[in-house]
Amino acid sequence: MDKLPVVSTFWRYVDSMGINQGKSLLTVISILRERVWKQLDLYYGRINISIDTTVETLYGSQQGGRKGHNTKNRGKKGYRPVLAFIDQTREYIAGKLRAGETISGQETADFIYEIKSRLPGCVQDVLLRADGEFCSWEAVAAAKACGFRFIFANKGCTPSFDSHAWYRPYQKSDIEYNDYFYQPMGRQEPCRFVVMRIPKEQETGKPIQLELLEEDRYTYRIFCTDKAGPAHKIIAEYDKRADVENLVGEAKREGLEAIPTGKFKSNYAFFQLVMPAYNIWRYMKLLAVQSEVVSETTEASTSGMKGIGANTLRIARLKMLLIAAKVVMDQNRTKVKYSIHDARTPLMIHFLNFLDEARNKPKAWLEDGGWRQNFAIA
């Protein structure tokens, strides 16, 4: 291809795509993930996967739009996509665009099986963390069938905890913890539930009506899990999932929130088209961090790369891509000239040289040895 097609051609192509093309893009993402991990010599035998759903508000008559949980735009139709991210690398592993309905138990089970089929070959142990929408027997059974550990926020289950088993791990805190094995109606076996209870704050300066029952004096957070260990440590591990909200918000700002057509199948494919671009920028940041490590043994200055691993994708683009330059023709050659007064120019040149050196080396994913690849292709 000599040049990129015009925008209208691109959008006509997107409009012709469907759900099958979207699923094929998930396979492309899986292949790319293994290649990048091999290239960067990453090995994660144990990973944490955080799952979350979000809302994309619709302002037209797009297919699949439903009225549902939409706190910002109550009463409006929307889509309700589900996304899963790997906490260690903050990359997208699986997800799909859905109609704007609450996800069902069977859908959660199918999604967990989908995650299982997308794991890199080096991963042996997985911890799933999800909110109350995944607290169903179908999801629990699927997680156990896949060999995953899980911590799901409770929704709809009302286990009865031993009143004598409450404990405080921190003496300066009034928060108490407990656990109990409970078999909700409709489940085939009991599950472990862990809970924390927080005393409700009393309004000062007003008459206080004492609660008759002890349970009414507390706010409860209950979780279903198959992990062993103290309840407070399990809940603390679940709370680390909060970062997935930032990842979902970042993906939406990168283009996920755009609804390009009125056809659900085309919007489904566009969803999976945006997420590889999101992951590629994640990989560019990982490569930038590696180039910074390599530069420590050379005289190259990459001070502008400092902290780029923790930057958002928008800030990473400002550092690595949005740099003023001039394109000139000289001796029948096209050249790109950067300003010597821009502090980011040396790091950009160093990073491009680092990428060229990596391209000229043997492909790490084609070499024998190391961990087995699940998505190796010729």
Indicate residue ranges for each PLM-predicted region.
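Active-site-proximal, Lys/Arg-enriched surface segment
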Residues: 3, 7-83
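A short, flexible helix-boundary coil/loop motif
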Residues: 281-378
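Domain-level cores of phosphate- or acyl-group-handling catalytic modules
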Residues: 102-159
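C-terminal catalytic subdomain
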Residues: 234-235, 241-298, 303
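Short acidic, glycine/serine/threonine-rich loops at helix termini
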Residues: 59-65, 93-97, 107, 137-143, ...
